[in-house]
Amino acid sequence: MSSEKQKRSKFSSRLGFVLSAAGSAVGLGNIWRFPYLAAKYGGGIFLLVYLLLMLTFGYTMIIAESAIGRMTRKSPVGAYAHFGKDWMFKAGGWINAIIPILIVPYYSVIGGWVCKYLFGYIQGETEAMATAEYFTEFIGNGVKTEFWFLIFTLLVLWVIFMGVENGIEKVSTFMMPILVILAILLSIYAITRKGAFAGVKYFLVPNIKNFSWMTVVSAMGQMFYSLSIAMGILITFGSYMKSDLSIEESTSHVEVFDTAIAVLAGLMIIPAVFVFSNGDPSVLKAGPSLMFITMPKIFASMGFGRVVGILFFALVFFAALTSAIALAESAVSTFQDELKWSRRRSTVVLLLIMVALGTLSALSYGPLSFVTILKNMPFLDFFDFLTNSVMMPIAAMATCLLVVRVIGVEGIAAEVMRKDAPFKRKAVFNFMIKYLCPFFVAIILFSSVAGVLGWIKF
C-alpha cells in the first residue's frame, strides 16, 4: 500500500462509517418529500414498492460506490482516474465531484431556514409561524435569510475543519442517536392523537387499488435521492473505510437507518395531517410548504404545540446538518486529493464558494427574485434542478458503466469480500448493476427533467 493511502483519513470503526453515511442519507428529503409522495401515491403500496427498490436498486448502488471508494482510496475524480486516463473517466469523476460543491450552498440556505424556525419556536412564536405570510415574509427578507444561511454554513465548516475522525465521525455519533429518539417521540405523539389511526392505516397497509406506474417512478426517484447516491459522498466515505470492515454489512445498516427514519417521518407527518384535515391527505404539499407552512399550522392546533415544534425542528436541524457535513466533506476531499491542498485551505476555499453561490440562493426569493433561469426558476430552484434532475442521474449512469465495462462485477465482488467478508446478495448485485440499474437511472433522468418541464406531474 502506498504511503499516500496509509496517510489517508479513516473512520475509526464500523459505527463511525455507518452513522456518518446514514447522516448523509437522512436529510430534508426524508422529512419533506417522502411523506408527501407516500400520501399521494398510495400510502402502503408506495411504501412496499419503496422497500423493494431499497433492497435491490439502492443496495446495489451504495455497494458499488462504497467499494470504488475503498479500493482506490480516492475521492471521485481520483477514483475514476484510477481506472483510466481517457476523458470519459475524467468527466465521470468530475461530475460526481462537482455535484456536492453545487448542492451544499443552497442546501445550507434551507438549513438556515430550519435554524430560524427552531429559534422561533424556542422564542415562543408558535402562533405567528403558523401562517403562510410568516414564511413568505422571511424568505423575502434578504438580510434575515443571509444571516441564518451564514450561521448554518459556519456550523458545517467548523465540523469539516475538525477532520474525519474528530469532526464528522464524532458529530454523527452524537447527533444520529438523538435524531432517532426525536423521530420516535414525535411519531408516538402523532399516532396517539384522536383520529390518527386512519392515517397510520393508509400509510402502512398496502392497497393494490392505489398502485400506478407513477407509484414506481416516484418511489424510485425518492429512494435514489435519499441514499446520497451519485453525490460523490459514498465514494469519499468508502475511501475512509478500513479494509477489515464488511462493506455489505456496513452499507446494509445505512439502508436500514435511512429507511427507518423515512418511515418514522411518515408516521410523524401523515397521521398528523389526517387529524388536522379530517382524513384528507391531499393537503400535503412537497418541499418547503410542508415543513414551513403546513406543519407549523398543525403544531399550533395541537396541545403542547411549542414543545412539539421545538422537537420537530431540532430533528430537521440534525438531519440537515449531517447531510450538509457529508456534502461539504466530499468537496473538501476532492480539493485535497486533486489540488494537494491542506484541509484548512480546502475548507476556506469551500467557504468562499458556499458564500458566493449560497448568497444567490438566499436572496433568490427576495432582492434577487427578479432574476430567473429556465422555466422562471429562482437561483435556488435552478441549482436544485441542475444537480438533482440532470447531473446526479448522469453521474449514476457513469458509475454503472464504470463497474460493468471497466472494473467488472467480479472486481467489485473481490473488494466487498476482502478478508473473507460476506457478500450474501452478490447475485442481486450482479443482475441489478448489469441490467436494471442503468434502466432505472434512465427513467429517473427522464422523469425528473419531464417533471420540471411540465410533461408529467408528481
Name every feature range the model reports, one short phrase each:
Residues M1-W32, M61-S66, R70-F83, W87-W94, ...:
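Membrane-interface "cap" regions at the ends of multi-pass membrane proteins
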Residues S2-E4, G78, G111-G140, M241-D244, ...:
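Helix-loop-helix connectors at the membrane interface of multi-pass transporters/channels
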Residues S2-K7, F11, L15, E169, ...:
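Membrane-embedded translocation segments of transport machinery
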Residues K5-R8, L37-Y41, P76-I95, S108-G167, ...:
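Inter-helical loop and helix-membrane interface segments of multi-pass membrane transporters/permeases
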Residues K10, G16-F17, S24, G142-F147, ...:
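Loop-to-transmembrane helix boundary motifs in multi-pass membrane proteins
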Residues S13-L53, G238, E249-S252, V256-T259, ...:
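Transmembrane helix-boundary motif of multi-pass solute transporters/channels
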Residues A38-A64, K144, M391-A395:
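Extracellular loop-to-transmembrane helix junctions
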Residues A91-A97, K340-L351, D384-V441:
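C-terminal membrane-solvent junction of multi-pass transporters and transport-like membrane proteins
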